[in-house]
From Swiss-Prot:
Organism, as annotated: Dictyostelium discoideum (Social amoeba)
Reaction(s) catalysed by this chain's protein: a hydroperoxide + [thioredoxin]-dithiol = an alcohol + [thioredoxin]-disulfide + H2O
InterPro entries: AhpC/TSA, Peroxiredoxin, Peroxiredoxin_C, Thioredoxin-like_sf, Thioredoxin_domain
GO cellular component, one term: phagocytic vesicle
Name under which the protein is recorded: Peroxiredoxin-4
Gene name, Swiss-Prot/TrEMBL: prdx4
Enzyme class: oxidoreductase
EC numbers for this chain: 1.11.1.24
Catalytic residue list: 111 (cysteine sulfenic acid (-soh) intermediate)
Length: 259
């Protein structure tokens, strides 16, 4: 009888102690475990201790954003090429520079002016060893309808560059240009080199169209630095004086341009 009474008292004491345990603050979650980040498109889950002393999964995306000198995210999708549907991928452009530009939507306002301007400059890009690809979240059918619409009606009226379809929005998200609240992309441009590395990232807010001349200038400047190992100062254009990136070389440059 005494043993049973003693056991009951111990149990009662334990219950009282449990009731008086100070809860973990909701502002101070106990960190339990973090999985190492990866560049996989899958999410990683971290385990935290919540204010009820219970384990809970917190899931968030760990896809790294594109970075300069890092590999461009692989892509594959249906495109309209020379009026035909065709699957294209990043692998198709190995050994070449690729200027991949995103625009918000087909049948809009600034977008056709950009695409036509890039299309008109396609030969100059090709002479510099660079291919052009435009991309939006529209379907390939919408792309084709827009291409076949006369320019005087706001269409493209035939173009010399592929238009890639990103219906799932995955390519746009991988390249960091998708705006969730808008449901489409901003004007993002990515220059990828022959090794598949990202070399230039530019982003315009949607009211402002891009400069094709600046895209060509930057492409030629990068090609020059890749080939000759010298650097290009501000506003450098093909044929301008470049600079050796060392104290002696920079002094020679500054003396030459400041006579």
């Amino acid at each position: 009888m005494r043993s049973a009474t003693k056991l009951f008292k111990n149990l009662s004491k334990s219950v009282v102690q449990l009731k008086t345990v100070k809860p973990v603050s909701s502002l101070n979650f106990g960190y339990i475990k973090t999985r190492q980040f990866s560049t996989s498109t899958t999410d990683s889950s971290n385990l935290f201790l919540n204010n009820n002393n219970q384990f809970q999964n917190f899931t968030f995306p760990t896809k790294q954003q594109i970075r300069i000198r890092k590999p461009a995210p692989a892509f594959k999708g249906q495109a309209v090429v020379n009026g035909e549907f065709k699957e294209i991928s990043l692998d198709d452009y190995k050994g070449k520079y690729l200027y991949l530009f995103f625009y918000p939507l087909d049948f809009t306002f600034v977008c056709p002016t950009e695409i036509i301007a890039f299309s008109n400059a396609a030969e100059e890009f090709k002479k510099a060893g660079c291919e052009l690809v435009g991309c939006s979240i529209d379907s390939p059918f919408t792309h084709l309808a827009w291409i076949n619409t006369p320019r005087k009606e706001g269409g493209l009226g035939g173009i010399n560059i592929p238009l890639l379809s990103d219906l799932t929005h995955q390519i746009s998200k991988d390249y960091g240009v998708y705006i969730e609240e808008d449901g489409h992309t901003i004007r993002g441009s990515i220059l990828i080199d022959k090794e598949g590395l990202v070399r230039v990232i530019t982003m315009n807010d949607n009211p402002v169209g891009r400069s094709v001349d600046e895209a060509i200038r930057t492409l030629k400047a990068l090609k020059f630095t890749d080939q000759f190992g010298e650097v290009c100062p501000a506003n450098w254009s093909e044929g301008d004086k470049s600079m050796k990136a060392d104290p002696k070389g920079s002094k020679e440059y500054f003396e030459a341009v400041n006579k």
